[in-house]
UniProtKB/Swiss-Prot annotation:
It catalyses: ATP + H2O + a folded polypeptide = ADP + phosphate + an unfolded polypeptide. It is found in: Cytoplasm. This is Chaperonin GroEL 2. It is an enzyme of class 5 (isomerase). It comes from the Bacteria. The gene is groEL2. It comes from Bradyrhizobium diazoefficiens (strain JCM 10833 / BCRC 13528 / IAM 13628 / NBRC 14792 / USDA 110).
Length: 550
């Protein structure tokens, strides 16, 4: 076990505070509409330019182990805020740094850290209650677009794309953000369920111009195993031919005699049929086939359930109004599944999303949820250069999460004003002792910092701006740093999602309170590099060169 270095008390807190300040100074410059960019060096490729607080925070790793611990704790605030609300990472970092700085001063002055923490917790509870009380529900598309615009640093085009996407796929639908190959940013909405498997054979194509299979009012056979023998399929094929409807087969694979027969029948025109490989692998494939079965009102044919293919009847097949299959994707539109069954399945997937601890599983479950709940919207972000596209994609991601949060919990006036107004309500809080009162005062002071920093980034005097805002009692009255005017921020479209503001203060106070109550820090002592590459000194034991004269 390697040696450890231990720091105590004021020494520990000073080193930690230095790390917090370094991270805070790098992140705070990005806050607000006039926030600056930060350039991040990459080990390969061009440097990355971003205005996203959490992206900057994630890049920071300090050489001094003790300073690094402080920086990493505050980085956690930004990451947690991004995970929970998708935005507000810079605000959370500014709040955390302010609480830590003021708290460390109070501890150094001899106050009880645990009472300070209790005071901080009481203050945060009061602030959250005030935010929730003043929150306004989001209903119109204009308001959704405004939230997206603010979060994308004033880019109205991004706000409109997100508003359109949410209008088309609903608030629950999945919106994915990709990099486009062109200059333009575009929105594409895939209705119904789409999965990334195309036709097994091009001979199934019905629309030769688009190289696509298009089938209306089709039966859907969902089979878990491979299909290779024809005899097990025959009874079903005869029933489908008599019905006169097309048939789509989704199976692990279709090969050999079965595939040859289907292709021949398709070419001769006796049977409208197409075969597709099942999406996913293993247990996820079973779950996705079950989703398709519920969506189309059919049954997944599986040996686990004791159903054999030769015993399948027409009423066990799914139905869909339209099925489109191209080389890479299959889309099922308007399946005939019962609404109650689909809703029950959606509720089941939501429960699994809540329980899972894996980010990958959560992402896959959310995709499945969206496919059942009404479609997927894809925003393709364009730009002139790769650096520009990446920077814009960051902002679209932020804006999308913020918009979701706004729909969930409502909106508040932006520009740090909601926190500033909440700070006024902390003056009357009753505490058990003076140290707890100081804890409340620390939070009250910290709540003015986001508004102050937004003004500073716009080249104004933060203290003057904050003072002028607090002179007026109107809740939404604040400073628009984009235009340099005061007024009603909500009517100007400067708004923040309640969830983003709430999560920012809760996470900031949680981590800051832990840092304030820290009394000792332990870090590994860096190993001294001898520079000899592991060989013993003195040339690694090689003898003299024995009379080798040159």
């Amino acid at each position: 076990m390697s040696a450890k270095e231990v720091k105590f008390g004021v020494d520990a807190r000073d080193r930690m505070l230095r790390g917090v300040d370094i991270l805070h100074n790098a992140v705070k410059v990005t806050l607000g509409p006039k926030g600056r960019n930060v350039v991040l060096d990459k080990s390969f490729g061009a440097p990355r330019i971003t205005k996203d607080g959490v992206t900057v925070a994630k890049e920071i790793e300090l050489e001094d182990k003790f300073e690094n611990m402080g920086a990493q704790m505050v980085r956690e605030v930004a990451s947690k805020s991004a995970d929970a609300a998708g935005d507000g990472t810079t605000t959370a970092t500014v709040l955390a740094a302010a609480i830590v700085r003021e708290g460390a001063k109070s501890v150094a002055a001899g106050m009880n850290p645990m009472d300070l923490k209790r005071g901080i917790d009481m203050a945060v509870e009061a602030v959250v209650a005030d935010l929730v009380k003043n929150s306004k529900k989001v209903t119109s598309n204009e308001e959704i677009a405004q939230v997206g615009t603010i979060s994308a640093n004033g880019d109205a085009e991004i706000g409109k794309f997100i508003s359109d996407a949410m209008k088309k796929v609903g608030n629950e639908g999945v919106i994915t953000v990709e990099e486009a190959k062109s200059l333009e940013t575009e929105l594409e909405v895939v209705e119904g369920m789409q999965f990334d498997r195309g036709y097994i054979s091009p001979y199934f194509v019905t629309n030769a111009d688009k190289m696509r299979v298009e089938m209306d009012d089709a039966y859907v056979l969902i089979n878990e195993k491979k299909l290779s023998q024809l005899n097990e399929l025959l009874p079903l094929l005869e029933a489908v031919v008599q019905s006169g409807k097309p048939l789509v087969i989704i199976a692990e694979d279709v090969e050999g005699e079965a595939l040859a027969t289907l292709v021949v029948n398709r070419l001769r025109g006796g049977l409208k049929v197409a075969a597709v490989k099942a999406p996913g692998f293993g247990d996820r494939r079973k779950a996705m086939l079950q989703d398709i079965a519920i969506l189309t009102g059919g049954q997944a044919i599986s040996e686990d359930l004791g159903i054999k293919l030769e015993n399948v009847t027409l009423n066990m097949l799914g139905r869909a109004k339209k099925v489109m299959i191209d080389k890479e994707n299959t889309t099922i539109v308007s399946g005939a599944g019962k609404k109650a069954d689909i809703e029950a399945r959606v509720a089941q997937i939501k429960a699994q999303i809540e329980e899972t601890t894996s980010d990958y599983d959560r992402e896959k479950l959310q995709e499945r949820l969206a496919k059942l709940a009404g479609g997927v919207a894809v925003i393709r972000v364009g730009g002139a250069t790769e650096v520009e596209v990446k920077e814009r994609k960051d902002r679209v991601d932020d804006a999308m999460h913020a918009t979701r949060a706004a729909v969930e919990e409502g909106i508040l006036p932006g520009g740090g004003v909601a926190l500033l107004r909440a700070s006024e309500h902390l003056k009357g809080i009753r505490t058990k002792n003076d140290d707890q009162k100081t804890g409340v005062e620390i939070v009250r002071k910290a709540l003015s910092y986001p508004a102050r920093q937004i003004a500073i980034n716009a080249g104004e005097d933060g203290s003057v701006i904050v003072g002028k805002i607090l002179e007026k009692d109107q809740y939404s009255y604040g400073y628009d740093s984009q235009t340099g005017e005061y007024g009603n921020l909500v009517s100007k479209g400067i708004i923040d999602p309640t969830k983003v503001v709430r999560v920012a203060i809760q996470n900031a106070a949680s981590v800051a309170a832990l840092l304030i109550t820290t009394e000792a820090m332990v870090a590994e002592v860096p190993k001294k590099n001898t520079g000899a590459g592991g060989m013993p000194p003195g040339g690694g034991g090689m003898g003299g060169m024995g009379g080798m004269d040159f």
